Amino acid sequence: MGSHPTPGLQRTTSAGYRLPPTRPPASVSPAARGGPMASRGLAGGCQAPQALKAQRVAQGAACDGVQQDQLWRELLEAERRGQQRWIQNWSFLKDYDPMGNKKEPEKLPDHVPLFSDTVPSSTNQVVGSRLDTPLGQTLIRMDFFFTEGARKKKLEDQMQPI
């Protein structure tokens, strides 16, 4: 037996109450037990979205919508600052190819028509634009004959109601 606790079993008092473990089990990560690499809180002490649900419940109302909004604004501002830094430091690279030769800018046409002659301008025309072709006419004819049995038919005179 000895004085060393058995791994996997919790300590209890003589009255049957469970005592907290003297050290956390090895299966618990350092971040979860609050070690040196514990997750840092974000703006206003609010945890990151991937934080454990238990931590969010323990924090209570500290992680409300206002703090989430503030966090979002800070993240957007950091993104904008990163874009500005890239423009200042690295934007010259977009004017050169991988071999270091200066790229020629593409010449744009003087006039671009608003509507295309070959591509329909709406979804309905996409369906209807190909029905005037010989293949479209053949498909219409085949569809008409294949669905003939499913169509409503006029009853014969003797089957008509009086």
Swiss-Prot record:
One of its GO terms (cellular component) is cilium. Keywords: Cell projection. The keyword Protease does not apply. Pfam families: LLC1. InterPro entries: C20orf85-like. Its main location: other. Residues 1-44 are annotated as: Disordered. It is found in: Cell projection, Cilium. This is Ciliary microtubule inner protein 5. It comes from Homo sapiens.
